[in-house]
């Protein structure tokens, strides 16, 4: 007979006989889920039974106490008593109670393990019983083949030993199948969800140690590990193994991947290590970055689709006599021609160029560096007419040319660093002379770009000498140069020196430059930068707090760390300085790069703030996080902001809108045409403020950047890492707020939208086709700008006598009163008809658009040539043809960039695409293979 109350059983607990108590506990346990509310009244007695060490069934008492606390919702106490129950608590029991207790146990274990690992609480004690539950669950997961679940929990709990044992166990079972997938899973988890830098490094080194001894290792996963660790010695080991196994084409592909994703420090050190071992000259050349840049320059030049009429319209609408407008057109021209090596617009508009004054000349000259970005062979030759020592007399042209040189060689400056460094050393002793300061300004920015991330000590010392001269013009640029050179190094000595000097100097420009330098030095360092960030944010100097916001942005870039997001939001609404508030909101864009879809929701309220600087920051945050994504939610927030009352908010909104919309076609987003025309209307409108016009002109340049063949890609799809150069380019670009020439830094973020198939045997680009399974017109270029020819001729009013005018007015008034009623009726009818027509058209458009988006895929492919424009959204539709002569060395997974190809018919001649470098090569090219026929019939020739 079933019990309806627990009272009799609870009464038995008061008996003295231990066996009676044990029976009562056993019976209560069976019905505790039903009678827990009654049992809860006697909890103190049950707990007392557990506390009695002489009572044999005390573990059962603990189990009952746990179940009662579970039903009361007090999970911490429930876990405590469940652990005390030891073997009485059956971890395999399939009940909600057990699942909840196990889940809460693991949560508690992870929390305590995190505290211990971070040493945030040295007195923290980890209950061994909690560890037993955790390890039992790990065993249970592996027995059920739930390896990913076990690895994920182990990573969260900082249990590297568990991760290692699971991976080794799987490697022992099968060397190729599931184990490689698990390795890839751990790599992805480590790079996207593990926020502790030290533990992340430990995981990656473990993966490298496990992968390297394997006979059939996946070297592409290994290369991703190397890039994330940024360790040249590990990279050298990888290439040595590839060399020993004679996997030349695979090593070439990995080298190209490293060029597009690794730091300059890693590339230079790796090149040096392999040079000492007399490695394959082809591999060494790839590591210099010259072939990659040459391929991209060739693509951008051959496929350029520059809307020159748009640029001409901007130029004619903005008066070049004003420095602001001249700089806007220079920057826009630089963007539109970025990487194409085509400076025809400048040559065709020399009279306009001559209008430039002072710093506008500096910007115009530097824009040549943007146009020739990546031209590593002829870069210095192109800039030679403007460099110091040439016939040019203007100090602004000389300074601008040195900055331009840095923009050409950004990230690949091995051959130009010494030249730029010489200018710093020769002139640093004569600062204070305005001519010298302008030259040093350009040289400091140039050398910072060329030596980016190398931690070159000689460059650092030369820049420090310029900085300590305490001249605002050269000192600010020297600070930026130091930040770029020491990018991501976290050099403690440099950090202390720069922070101290930022507090001491009386020049605001230098303080702000040093604050940004500190942010750059702490790039990607996460919690290791916390101490400095707290010091900067606690400073009374708003310029240092400004740098603190950017330090958060760059130290935690792409992490999506909640703690950091909260800190930035608090700073955005509480700081007394507008610049700091704007920087804090902008920083959200960097932190949430990988979670970009959440940004419109987070900044929505800030975009409607009463504070114009918060609104401006919200616009920049959207532009940065959603760059190149075409995210509709971001566009919906930004579009109303282009009509904001504050001119600088409109400027930020237009620039950010162009960052989001870059490489969007009219079929992908119908708003492309209207946004472009809005930018143009702002430029041509005489009543718009100068800042808004500047923003519109720059935005047009971004929308049509690189001959309409580049995008902004902040994450490297192949390695899963952030593109450091792109992130730094955007961060430095935001400084145009204070100094317009900084706008050129955005060119660092431009990524060509192409697939370049390269033959592994000779690094030439063969002509062949790929399949694209999409509708052919989806990804076509937007229409070129055409100025309407049917402009109305303005009529000149004829003179009328005053008496005649009065008579006409009286007659008109009488007639008007008669016709008013009839006109009103007709007008209302017309308006109604118009509205109905508009609604019908809008409905048809939305239906057509919806239908189009659903049916973007086509079962019948069309052919695209090698080195064609392939948009990021198009990549998933592209496939290599299996029967084709050229096939990729690595399985193609829809990523752009350089793809090394295997030639399946190497003895047959192939058509080759000539690169920019090859077209200028004075040496005779190697002859193409040909067949010799022994017997020739000369009569038939």
Swiss-Prot record:
Protein purpose: Acts as a regulatory subunit of the 26S proteasome which is involved in the ATP-dependent degradation of ubiquitinated proteins.
Biased composition (Basic and acidic residues): 816-854
GO molecular function, one term: ubiquitin protein ligase binding
InterPro entries: 26S_Psome_Rpn2, ARM-like, ARM-type_fold, Proteasome/cyclosome_rpt, PSMD1_RPN2_N, RPN2_C
Gene transcribed to yield this protein: RPN2
PANTHER family associated with the record: 26S PROTEASOME NON-ATPASE REGULATORY SUBUNIT, 26S PROTEASOME NON-ATPASE REGULATORY SUBUNIT 1
Keyword annotations from UniProtKB, A to Z: Proteasome, Repeat
Family according to the record: Belongs to the proteasome subunit S1 family.
Region (Disordered): 808-854
Residue stretches of each PC repeat: 363-396, 400-437, 442-476, 477-511, 513-546, 547-582, 583-615, 617-651, 652-689, 695-731
GO cellular component: nucleus; proteasome regulatory particle, base subcomplex; proteasome storage granule
Entry's Gene Ontology BP terms: proteasome assembly; proteasome-mediated ubiquitin-dependent protein catabolic process; regulation of protein catabolic process
Keyword Iron appears in the UniProt entry: no
Protein's name according to its UniProt entry: 26S proteasome regulatory subunit RPN2
């Amino acid at each position: 007979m079933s019990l309806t109350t627990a009272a009799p059983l609870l009464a038995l607990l008061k008996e003295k006989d231990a066996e009676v108590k044990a029976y009562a506990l056993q019976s209560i346990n069976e019905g505790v889920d039903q009678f827990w509310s009654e049992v809860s009244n006697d909890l103190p007695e049950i707990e007392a039974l557990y506390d009695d060490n002489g009572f044999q069934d005390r573990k059962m008492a603990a189990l009952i106490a746990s179940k009662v606390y579970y039903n009361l919702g007090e999970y911490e106490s429930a876990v405590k008593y469940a652990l005390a129950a030891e073997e009485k608590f059956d971890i395999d029991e399939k009940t909600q109670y057990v699942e909840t207790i196990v889940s809460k146990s693991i949560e508690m274990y992870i929390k305590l393990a995190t505290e211990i690992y971070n040493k945030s609480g040295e007195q923290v004690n980890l209950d061994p019983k909690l560890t037993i539950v955790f390890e039992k669950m790990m065993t249970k997961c592996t027995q059920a083949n739930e390896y990913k679940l076990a690895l994920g929990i182990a990573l969260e709990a900082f249990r590297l030993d568990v991760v290692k044992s699971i991976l080794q166990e799987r490697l022992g079972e099968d060397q190729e199948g599931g184990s490689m997938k698990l390795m890839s899973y751990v790599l992805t988890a480590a790079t996207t969800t593990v926020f502790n830098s030290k533990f992340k490094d430990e995981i990656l080194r473990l993966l490298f140690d496990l992968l390297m001894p394997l006979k059939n290792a996946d070297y592409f996963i290994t290369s991703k590990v190397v890039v994330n660790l940024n360790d040249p010695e590990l990279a050298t080991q990888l290439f040595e193994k590839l060399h020993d196994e004679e996997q030349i084409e695979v090593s070439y592909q990995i080298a190209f991947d490293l060029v597009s994703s690794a730091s300059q420090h890693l590339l230079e050190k790796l090149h040096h290590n392999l040079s000492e071992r007399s490695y394959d000259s082809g591999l060494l050349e790839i590591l210099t970055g010259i072939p990659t840049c040459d391929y991209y320059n060739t693509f951008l030049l051959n496929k350029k689709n520059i809307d020159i009429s748009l640029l001409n319209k901007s130029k004619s609408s903005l008066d070049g006599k004003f420095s602001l407008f001249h700089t806007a057109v220079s920057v826009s021209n630089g963007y539109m021609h970025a990487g194409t090596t085509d400076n025809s617009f400048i040559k065709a508009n020399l009279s306009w160029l001559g209008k430039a004054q002072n710093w506008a000349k500096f910007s115009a000259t530097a824009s040549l560096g943007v146009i020739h970005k990546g031209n590593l062979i002829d870069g210095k030759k192109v800039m030679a007419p403007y460099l110091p020592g040439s016939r040019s007399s203007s100090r602004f042209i000389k300074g601008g040319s040195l900055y331009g040189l840095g923009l050409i060689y950004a990230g690949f400056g091995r051959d130009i660093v010494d030249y730029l460094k010489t200018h710093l050393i020769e002139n640093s002793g004569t600062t204070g002379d305005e001519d010298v300061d302008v030259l040093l300004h350009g040289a400091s920015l140039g050398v910072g770009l060329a030596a980016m991330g190398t931690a070159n000590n000689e460059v650092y010392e030369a820049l420090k000498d310029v900085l300590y001269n305490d001249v605002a013009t050269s000192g600010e640029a020297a600070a930026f140069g130091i930040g770029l050179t020491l990018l991501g190094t976290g050099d403690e000595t440099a950090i202390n020196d720069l922070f101290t000097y930022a507090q001491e100097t009386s020049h605001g420009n230098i303080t702000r430059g040093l604050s940004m330098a500190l942010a750059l030095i702490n790039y990607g360092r996460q919690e290791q930068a916390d101490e400095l960030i707290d010091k900067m944010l606690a400073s009374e100097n708003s310029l240092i707090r400004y740098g603190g916001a950017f330090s958060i942005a760059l130290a935690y870039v792409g992490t999506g760390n909640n703690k950091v997001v909260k800190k930035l939001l608090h700073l955005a609404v509480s700081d007394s300085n507008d610049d700091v508030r704007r920087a804090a909101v902008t920083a959200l864009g960097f932190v949430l790069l990988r979670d970009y879809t959440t940004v419109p929701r987070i900044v929505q309220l800030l975009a409607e703030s009463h504070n114009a600087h918060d609104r401006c920051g919200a616009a920049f945050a959207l532009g940065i996080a959603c760059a190149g994504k075409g995210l509709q939610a971001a566009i919906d927030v930004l579009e109303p902001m282009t009509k904001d009352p504050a001119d600088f908010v409109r400027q930020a909104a237009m620039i950010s809108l162009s960052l989001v919309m870059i490489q969007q076609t009219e079929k992908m987003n119908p708003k492309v045409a209207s946004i472009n025309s809005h930018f143009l209307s702002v430029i041509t409108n005489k009543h718009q403020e100068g800042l808004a016009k500047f923003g519109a002109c720059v935005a047009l340049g971004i929308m049509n950047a690189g001959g309409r063949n580049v995008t902004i890609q902040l994450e490297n799809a192949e390695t899963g890492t952030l593109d450091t150069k792109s992130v730094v380019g955007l961060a430095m670009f935001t400084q145009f707020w204070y100094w317009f020439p900084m706008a050129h830094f955005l060119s660092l973020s431009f990524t060509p939208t192409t697939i370049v198939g390269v033959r592994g045997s000779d690094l030439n680009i063969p002509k062949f086709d790929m399949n694209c399974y999409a509708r052919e017109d989806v990804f076509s270029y937007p229409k070129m700008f055409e100025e309407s020819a049917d402009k109305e001729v303005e009529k000149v009013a004829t003179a009328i006598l005053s008496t005649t005018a009065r008579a006409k007015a009286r007659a008109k008034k009488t007639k008007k009163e008669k016709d008013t009623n009839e006109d009103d009726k007709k007008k209302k009818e017309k308006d109604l008809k118009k509205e109905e027509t508009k609604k019908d058209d809008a409905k048809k458009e939305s239906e057509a658009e919806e239908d189009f988006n659903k049916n973007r895929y086509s079962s019948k492919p069309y052919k695209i040539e090698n080195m064609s424009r392939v948009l990021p959204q198009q990549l998933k539709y592209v496939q290599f043809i299996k029967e084709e002569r050229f096939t990729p060395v690595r399985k193609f997974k829809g990523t752009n960039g350089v793809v090394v190809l295997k030639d399946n018919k190497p003895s047959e001649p192939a058509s080759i695409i000539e690169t920019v470098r090859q077209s200028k090569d004075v040496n005779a090219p190697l002859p193409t293979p040909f067949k010799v026929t022994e017997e020739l019939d000369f009569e038939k020739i």
